[in-house]
Regions:
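C-terminal peripheral helix-coil segments that are non-catalytic and often amphipathic
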Residues: 1-7, 140, 144-152, 185-244
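Helix-turn-helix
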Residues: 22, 30-64, 68
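Short hydrophobic clusters on alpha-helical segments that form packing/core surfaces
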Residues: 23-31, 102, 199
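Conserved hydrophobic residue
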Residues: 37, 155-156, 184
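Hydrophobic alpha-helical connector segments
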Residues: 68, 82-112, 168, 192
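Short, basic, alpha-helical segments at the C-terminal edge of helix-turn-helix-like DNA-binding modules
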Residues: 71-78
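Amphipathic alpha-helical segments used for helix-helix packing
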Residues: 94, 107-126, 143, 177, ...
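Amphipathic alpha-helical packing segments from all-alpha helical-bundle domains
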Residues: 126-152, 161-177, 190-193, 197
Length: 244
């Protein structure tokens, strides 16, 4: 085993980018395990393998570190979803994709979702932050889908895209809040189908809820897009689950 001084020299030689990455990874673990209030900078430093002063070299305080962790989470979701979304066609499928991936992110990372809802979003400086802009980009994908659907004649022209966005994400937050409190569970696919059918039925000309088979096809297209993105395969144009 190398002497302790050698390990210390090795840590000191790490480039700043690597140190920041290690600190943020450790901070994410501690925030997820303990929440924001009970997370200590000393715990994060210990887990990252750095001295406490190194954290303050890159981050002003614990709150800034939390914001950076959640920013990174949003950036990852936007990047990953963009690769898969390129393969999705048809307004019903696109709306469902956005709803399903959002529900999946909440189900997969409930602690980060709670931190966003409880610690970051209520802050008075949130609306002027980079994270606010990331969240706007994340939710405005639905606005873009609705606008495109109106332009193509799929969706009613009197539809308010921003109202649809608020209805969908407000509905998701309300329906998943019990889960985030540790009270029960939910199925992202089933909930995505239910919300998508309800919303699209109200927006489309003569729109009707998707049949069970159409829902299955939509899930298969979403799964295929994920696999192709993971394998680096250029997405092929899929068959829409609903005729357009």
């Amino acid at each position: 085993m190398p002497p302790r001084t050698a390990l210390k020299r090795q840590v000191n030689r790490l480039p700043p980018e690597r140190r920041i990455s290690d600190i943020m990874a450790a901070a994410k673990e501690v925030f997820v395990e303990k929440g924001y209030n009970d997370a200590l900078i000393t715990d994060i430093a210990l887990r990252a393998g750095v001295v406490e002063g190194s954290i303050y070299r890159f981050f002003a305080n614990k709150r800034e570190l939390l914001v950076k962790v959640v920013e990174h989470w949003f950036e990852e979701m936007l990047r990953d979803d963009a690769e898969q979304f390129a393969a999705v066609r048809g307004s019903w499928n696109q709306i469902r994709f956005i709803i399903y991936t959002h529900l999946t992110s909440i189900h997969r990372d409930p602690a980060l979702s709670r931190l966003m809802f409880q610690e970051i979003r209520p802050a008075p400086d949130y609306r002027g932050s980079h994270l606010f802009e990331l969240n706007r980009a994340y939710t405005n994908r639905l606005v873009d889908v609705v606008k495109a659907g109106i332009a193509s004649g799929e969706l009613r022209p009197e539809t308010s895209p921003s109202l649809v966005r608020d209805l969908v994400f407000g509905c998701i937050e309300h329906r998943t809040w019990a889960f985030l409190r540790g009270e029960g569970d939910f199925d992202p696919a089933e909930m995505a189908d239910a919300i998508t059918n309800l919303v699209h039925h109200g927006l489309a000309f003569g729109g009707e809820p998707a049949s069970p088979m159409e829902s299955v096809v939509a899930r298969l297209e979403t799964a295929t897009a994920r696999l192709e993105a993971a394998a680096g395969i250029a997405p092929a144009k899929p068959t829409s689950a609903r005729p357009r």
